[in-house]
Amino acid sequence: MTTAAALSVLRLGTRRSTLARAQTEEIAGALRAAGCRVEIVGIQSTGDRHADVPLHEFAGSGVFVAELRAALLRGEVDVVVHSMKDLPTAEIPELAIAAIPRRADPRDALVTGAGCRLAELPTGAIVGTGSPRRAAQLRLLRPDLEIRPIRGNLDTRLGKLHAGGYAALIVAAAGLARLHRSEEAAEFFDPTVMLPAPGQGALAVECRRADIADGGRLAGILAGLDDPATRAAVTAERALLAAVGAGCSAPVGALGVVTADTLQLDAVVVDPSGTTAFRRSLTGTPDDASDLGRRLAADLIRAGADQLLQAPKQTGEPHDPDRHDKGTGRP
């Protein structure tokens, strides 16, 4: 096993957005504390390069991760850091998620120009989100609001809000926190009100599988970043997403919570129009996270959620940036 001191420089690949760099700095700081020398390498993703193109117009999946994975496979970087919610559920055999650090706040947050809460927004107020999951759950709560798509990184979206184009935005609480802008949130949605995207708030530290195999150069170094409770929760969420049909742009929310030796998984599938929702919960153990996710997916499908999963193909809804397709995001 290679020690941190024996490594020359560990190259961390990241998207170039401010939020992505902040996420990568979290990992870099932990590695430096463990004695590693770290170099951060910025890589432009397809999704960032074409920020004016609606996400549903991109072919395939992994628009925010494919270039990072390509650089990893070519040996140009040693590790890449992803937002877990951007990572497709299908694996690339040569790559492995070496660590899932402790999760940040998984909730969705409402940011409003006037600082008012959701219940205080006037009828017809324009709310921006590029996520069918958020849009559908918002329609359940406030069908009188006007929901419009919005693209761009978090800084860009917040700028559009403050320029007056929207009355409110729904964004990830973790993104606000990592940019030190949590004070701009008017409201944080309890998961009983709005379930987040699978993996929301979590980071994925990915490397070449051979590098963490027995005797691999990174074996042991990246493992120290892993949080078992977060890994179990995210594993259950992603297993559910894959089992219900992750290739669809359907509004699916899921959140796992580990308490002692218990893992509770809550999930929802919502009609894009916000008229119908199927919500179910199951409890199991962290060791059976994948099976728990698959069993809850089966419960949802038996309840009729599979009909909603087919609906987005005819709705014209934009692809959800919080969702992952069955594709690997492989270049």
Swiss-Prot record:
Pfam families: Porphobil_deam, Porphobil_deamC
Superkingdom in the source lineage: Bacteria
Family according to the record: Belongs to the HMBS family.
Metabolic or biological pathway: Porphyrin-containing compound metabolism; protoporphyrin-IX biosynthesis; coproporphyrinogen-III from 5-aminolevulinate: step 2/4
Annotated segments matching region Disordered: 307-331
Cofactor(s) recorded in Swiss-Prot or TrEMBL: dipyrromethane
Other known facts: The porphobilinogen subunits are added to the dipyrromethane group.
Modified residues (S-(dipyrrolylmethanemethyl)cysteine): C248
Subunit relationships: Monomer.
Keyword DNA repair annotated: no
GO molecular function: hydroxymethylbilane synthase activity
Protein name: Porphobilinogen deaminase
Details of cofactor binding: Binds 1 dipyrromethane group covalently.
Cross-referenced Gene3D superfamilies: Periplasmic binding protein-like II, Porphobilinogen deaminase, C-terminal domain
Organism: Acidothermus cellulolyticus (strain ATCC 43068 / DSM 8971 / 11B)
Bias type Basic and acidic residues, positions: 316-331
Keywords associated with the record: Porphyrin biosynthesis, Transferase
Function description: Tetrapolymerization of the monopyrrole PBG into the hydroxymethylbilane pre-uroporphyrinogen in several discrete steps.
EC number(s) per entry: 2.5.1.61
InterPro entries: HemC, Porphobilin_deaminase_cofac_BS, Porphobilin_deaminase_N, Porphobilinogen_deaminase_C, Porphobilinogen_deaminase_C_sf
GO cellular component, one term: cytoplasm
Record has Transferase as a keyword: yes
Catalytically driven reaction(s): 4 porphobilinogen + H2O = hydroxymethylbilane + 4 NH4(+)
Gene Ontology terms: biological process: protoporphyrinogen IX biosynthetic process
PROSITE patterns: PORPHOBILINOGEN_DEAM
